[in-house]
Swiss-Prot record:
Name the record gives this protein: Chorismate synthase
Naturally occurring in which organism (per UniProt): Streptococcus agalactiae serotype Ia (strain ATCC 27591 / A909 / CDC SS700)
Record bears the keyword Lyase: yes
Coiled-coil segments on the chain, per record: none
Superkingdom of the organism of origin: Bacteria
Pfam families: Chorismate_synt
Any GO BP annotation: amino acid biosynthetic process
Keywords tagged on the record: Amino-acid biosynthesis, Aromatic amino acid biosynthesis, FAD, Flavoprotein, FMN, Lyase, NADP
InterPro entries: Chorismate_synth, Chorismate_synth_AroC_sf, Chorismate_synthase_CS
Functional pathway: Metabolic intermediate biosynthesis; chorismate biosynthesis; chorismate from D-erythrose 4-phosphate and phosphoenolpyruvate: step 7/7
Amino acid sequence: MRYLTAGESHGPSLTAIIEGIPAGLKLSAKDINEDLKRRQGGYGRGNRMKIETDQVIISSGVRHGKTLGSPITLTVTNKDHSKWLDIMSVEDIEERLKQKRRIKHPRPGHADLVGGIKYRFDDLRNALERSSARETTMRVAIGAIAKRILKEIGIEIANHIVVFGGKEITVPDKLTVQQIKVLSSQSQVAIVNPSFEQEIKDYIDSVKKAGDTIGGVIETIVGGVPVGLGSYVHWDRKLDAKIAQAVVSINAFKGVEFGLGFKSGFLKGSQVMDSISWTKDQGYIRQSNNLGGFEGGMTNGEPIVVRGVMKPIPTLYKPLMSVDIDTHEPYRATVERSDPTALPAAGVVMEAVVATVLVTEVLEKFSSDNMYELKEAVKLYRNYVNHF
């Protein structure tokens, strides 16, 4: 499976082309729109979420509610584009109109300045538009398709916020993936402990009032993963490495860990490694999951537990100092529309990219032209593992 996305934040639309989805997968626009709606939710989101109400158009690769095995084309219209017709015009326009929304005061923490230098832009909007988190709309759409495949082969995925701007959320022990999914979806701030709900909302309100932003830590958990996805044979086939790359590719993500993650560096080996046992009913199991479901770059049958660290959103309503790229004089950074936090939405994106990587790996191991063959291959493999 592979894909490309295209489109600018305030352009006419966003597009994705996905190749490698097996034929026979039940799929409708509704399946994708549900996740697009989740991405636009969460406490603290701004006015653009009220403008867009994203709806996907499937223009190829699906017929009568089932995939055809051919490339799937997805499009999401940017409803806000009607207000940007001159600024985002494909054709050349008058110089005075170009200057109307030109960006020359780069925002610290964004791609503005470095993108302008790299591509020789005198209007930093050219970098801003594509580097915007608006692009993640299509990655969520792609992830929605990936999750449909995972569900068909008994793999489920969920996410929740574990740290909100320095405030750590106490997570109840031994929650299942399904329980996490339900609890997180019932929370406006995507947490699984309702006793923290109002505290986090009040905190977001105070941050917004101060013109500031906050980041945090998001945890994604995947259950029902077969043993042996990924490989130890080559560095670039390690599945945890592929997931790490995908997570850090999300806008504003600055770190990733699995299981105990960085805490492992403060512990002894006897405190970290997961003891192995065997039962007739379950086969090989671990007595703990400190390694987050991975050994040697391969899944070991335990749930995948991966956390991503999201920095605070760089666009500040009380902007930091920057420089005018024309005069090189000190200047306040440009202010674009922004939110105090986007953690709940980022959790949906993280869930999507993890699902996409997993499906790509599944389709590589169990190469199948159609969903029937895929499900049979996975079933046969699971049976083999249970009797190893």
